[in-house]
Amino acid sequence: MSNQHPKKVLEMVIRALIVDDSALIRKVLSDILNQDPKIAVIGTAINGEDGLEKVRKLKPDVVLLDNIMPVLDGLKTLSHIMEEFPTPVVIVSALGEKAEEITLTALEYGAVDVIEKPSGILSQSMHEMAEEICAKVRAVSKADLNNLGCIRDLEHQIPENHRKKKNSLREKTSVRNVLAIGASTGGPRALEKLIGSFPAEIPAAVLIVQHMPPGFTASLSKRLDAKSALRVKEAQEGDIMEEGTVFIAPGDYHMEIVRNKVNGFGEDTVHLSCGPKELGSRPSVNVLFRSVARIYGPRVISLVLTGMNCDGADGAEEIKKMGGKVIAEDQSSCVIYGMPGEIVRRNLADFVLPLDKMADEIVKIVR
């Protein structure tokens, strides 16, 4: 096959299979991945049925899978892969509400991460994303598939005493605590489990930075809102901080909190910006963490969940300096132990907890 690099396949490299019905996307992704000395494209497939045959035959280390295809669509293909040949899968997704919803469902079904399929001049925009694409493939090749259990019907797992009818017009009170959360690869699944475990009356505002392409965070917010006792929304410029509400940074925007006080009165609000990426990410966990450390000091509880690289560690240092608490997800429940691992390596964690123990500990702290 013309897109393969036989010489590299003989070495200790990550063996990638690309499944996409677009010949252009297959070629562009192949060109990008084959330029990375640690990755070799061992095959391509034109639809899900073809992809399953190639997975059976080639046994790749990572599959890049289009979410919308003829013959056998991405979700059905993913389900077969995870049931028959568990393999780290990265969803290659188009924009649009339908595609974004399918992608989030795929993440629930066992996909590890998502990359955006650009619109417009495909080849040019794809090559601009080359570094991110290669980094994700390298990271997901190390994913712990034991922690990719599906989180379906999560609403039924929420204790009855945690549920209440949501009220978008909550009584405005000063924010007593701030829970700041950072996540990357594996994060959407972890967030569903964590946010769905909080009681409605938790005395804290919740701020989340999840590394995702633009558009997907809006769909993620709606999905979490439907499965949580808390109100969950994609953050907007000027949103007023309030307890019992979860604010998710929109894709491609940094999220900070600013204090608007005049003569001692005013409210803390969300500020969004398109400033430079930090550690290759926008939104950045570090940007959020530094912001809440400055304003809330010892009232901050920060969580660093599953994810690649080390975003959040520098910000966690600032939170510690200001008297706040830092919680890192234990490796036993992480899909990728990059971000929380860096917290532990720097000795910044007050607690190191598996995902299913976090909510109870946080409720104890804030109450």
Curated annotation (Swiss-Prot):
Domain Response regulatory: 15-132
Catalytic activity line of the entry: [protein]-L-glutamate 5-O-methyl ester + H2O = L-glutamyl-[protein] + methanol + H(+); L-glutaminyl-[protein] + H2O = L-glutamyl-[protein] + NH4(+)
Cited SUPFAM superfamilies: CheY-like, Methylesterase CheB, C-terminal domain
Main location: cytoplasm
Domain called CheB-type methylesterase: residue spans: 172-367
Keyword terms, alphabetized: Chemotaxis, Cytoplasm, Hydrolase, Phosphoprotein
InterPro entries, A to Z: CheB-like (IPR008248), CheB_C (IPR035909), CheY-like_superfamily (IPR011006), Sig_transdc_resp-reg_Me-estase (IPR000673), Sig_transdc_resp-reg_receiver (IPR001789)
GO cellular component, one term: cytoplasm
Pfam (any one): Response_reg
Record's subcellular location: Cytoplasm
Keyword Membrane assigned: no
Active site, per annotation: S184, H211, D311
Post-translational modification: Phosphorylated by CheA. Phosphorylation of the N-terminal regulatory domain activates the methylesterase activity.
GO biological processes: chemotaxis
GO MF annotation: an example: protein-glutamine glutaminase activity
Residues with the 4-aspartylphosphate modification: D66
Enzyme class, spelled out: hydrolase
EC number: 3.1.1.61, 3.5.1.44
Domain notes: Contains a C-terminal catalytic domain, and an N-terminal region which modulates catalytic activity.
PANTHER family attached to this UniProt entry: PROTEIN-GLUTAMATE METHYLESTERASE/PROTEIN-GLUTAMINE GLUTAMINASE (PTHR42872), PROTEIN-GLUTAMATE METHYLESTERASE_PROTEIN-GLUTAMINE GLUTAMINASE (PTHR42872:SF6)
HAMAP family, per database record: CheB_chemtxs
Record-stated family: Belongs to the CheB family.
Role: Involved in chemotaxis. Part of a chemotaxis signal transduction system that modulates chemotaxis in response to various stimuli. Catalyzes the demethylation of specific methylglutamate residues introduced into the chemoreceptors (methyl-accepting chemotaxis proteins or MCP) by CheR. Also mediates the irreversible deamidation of specific glutamine residues to glutamic acid.
Name the record gives this protein: Protein-glutamate methylesterase/protein-glutamine glutaminase 2
